[in-house]
Amino acid sequence: MAKQIVFNEEARRALERGVNALAESVRVTLGPKGRNVVLDKKFGAPLITNDGVTIAREIELEDPFENMGAQLVKEVATKTNDVAGDGTTTATVLAQAIIREGLKNVAAGANPMGIKRGIEKAVESVVDDIKTNAKPIESKESIAQVASISAGDDNIGVLISDAMEKVGKDGVITVEEAKGMTTELKVVEGMQFDRGYLSAYMITDTDKMEAILNDPYILITDKKIGAIADILPVLEKVVQAGRQLLIIAEDIEGEALATLILNKLRGTFTCVAVKAPGFGDRRKAMLEDIAILTGGTVITEDLGLKLENTTIDMLGRARQIRVTKEETTIVEGSGSQDDIKSRVEAIKKQIDETTSDFDREKLQERLAKLAGGVAVIQVGAATEVEMKEKKLRIEDALAATRAAVEEGIVAGGGCALVDAAKALDSLKLTGDEKTGVAIVYRALEEPLRQIANNAGFEGSIVVEKVRNGGRGVGFNALTEAYEDMIAAGIVDPAKVTRSALQNAASIAAMLLTTECLVSDIPSKDNGAAAMAGMGGMGGMGGMM
């Protein structure tokens, strides 16, 4: 296919128009007084949101060269979202500012490669300053503050801090759409997996249709159980001890299942059987997790163990087990804390090493189940449009909170970036590298400038006042006052602020050094050609 090529200033201006089209759509959402953007959907109601990355993903421009610029900035927002989960609007605003200032200097004759080196050195210096001044986050109140700022709602902040308190910082917190109007937190304590009882005859509570076992033994195996003789020795020992039993196996069928049900109906002893969770190698790993959590052993031929030789000390224990039609929950397993801790460390190491997003997600689920349970935030709202918007805000706030726990917090409202700009004074560079540093210095003001503009203030006056105030003193756009941001609870995760700047500078520097754009020539006569081709079908009339 034929290509169209543009060079030099024409190429850079086309990219800049695309960058501006996307950035102007996103920047109006920044800050507590930012506006919403309505996104049209082919199916269903339009989506109303103030989430930068969601808006960026929807934008595609007709002009192929302008679209390249828009897609490059979209990459800034997407990468920041992937790394930190929030800060996508800040990253977009920073990228636009660096590109705008950079292109001015390139047009005036500066060397783009020199500017690029200056930008990289400046960003490194600012990131060091952000990391140095980040404060670790410990208290429940601090977690609530971070979540509240990100979501723009104090109630959501409290909900997320409650969830983190209950399931721990490594715990899984999921966000789901609720049926009703209220947004609430539901916590599943202990380990839960998606397998229910094999027969409804095993239930102990007919009202709730669930089986509850108190202080039971747990037999864990990766084998199929078909003959009762395989498990008879261990069953007899459990009956003698007067305890209940949970069997987790690949499957239980035929004579073995019938015998267990018969004993339950006669009241001889209570036993519930469930299938093992997961598939293949993941199933083996999950069975091992359950064994470590409950202090049992997986009966598997890989370890040279046979079902008929199982002894009672190979069985796991737990305070309580709840089994419904679809899931099993193990509460307070009796495993050794040291063993659980080393298993958690091993899974964390696997998470760091894996390159597959799917594997990482599954490993994080396993980690959460071992580390203390799962919290579900159920999002309620009056309309579906409101629910979707609220769900996006909660997901952003959750990601921001995790980032804050990881690397600490800095003053919010764009204040940390203006403070960090002072670190650039120590860089003694010359020529175009010095110009690169000046570009970053100006760009660091842009988020604060935009927050002030969205609140109806003159951005340059606000920036000047914040720069002359002490470190950490910023502009609270909500109360329209200048105050200590951290003391006022206006904080941003250091990881979000750092990632936004690094990703913005990376893409902006690449764009400044672009000299040529190549694109397909849009075909103008596709529709006409197709219709002309169909014209020949008129001759088919003679076939009748």
Curated annotation (Swiss-Prot):
Question: Which HAMAP family is this protein grouped with?
Answer: CH60 (MF_00600)
Family matches, as InterPro entries: Chaperonin_Cpn60_CS, Cpn60/GroEL, Cpn60/GroEL/TCP-1, GroEL-like_apical_dom_sf, GROEL-like_equatorial_sf, TCP-1-like_intermed_sf
Residues binding ATP = T29, L30, G31, P32, D86, G87, T88, T89, T90, G413, N476, A477, L478, D492
Q: Kindly list the places in or outside the cell where this protein is found, as annotated in its UniProt entry.
A: Cytoplasm
Q: Which Pfam families match?
A: Cpn60_TCP1
Catalytic function, reaction form:
ATP + H2O + a folded polypeptide = ADP + phosphate + an unfolded polypeptide
| Single biological process term from Gene Ontology | protein refolding
Q: Which family does it belong to?
A: Belongs to the chaperonin (HSP60) family.
- Molecular function in Gene Ontology: ATP binding; ATP-dependent protein folding chaperone; isomerase activity; unfolded protein binding
Q: Which UniProt keywords apply?
A: ATP-binding, Chaperone, Cytoplasm, Isomerase, Nucleotide-binding
Chief subcellular location equals cytoplasm
In its keyword annotation, does this UniProt entry include Nucleotide-binding? yes
Gene3D superfamilies with a match to the protein in the record = GroEL, GroEL-like equatorial domain, TCP-1-like chaperonin intermediate domain
The EC number on file is 5.6.1.7
Q: What class of enzyme is it?
A: isomerase
The free-text function statement in the UniProt record for this protein reads: Together with its co-chaperonin GroES, plays an essential role in assisting protein folding. The GroEL-GroES system forms a nano-cage that allows encapsulation of the non-native substrate proteins and provides a physical environment optimized to promote and accelerate protein folding.
- Give me the Gene Ontology terms describing cellular component: cytoplasm
The protein's name in its UniProt record: Chaperonin GroEL
Q: What PROSITE patterns does the record tag this protein with?
A: CHAPERONINS_CPN60
Assembly behavior: Forms a cylinder of 14 subunits composed of two heptameric rings stacked back-to-back. Interacts with the co-chaperonin GroES.
Q: Which organism is it from?
A: Desulfitobacterium hafniense (strain Y51)
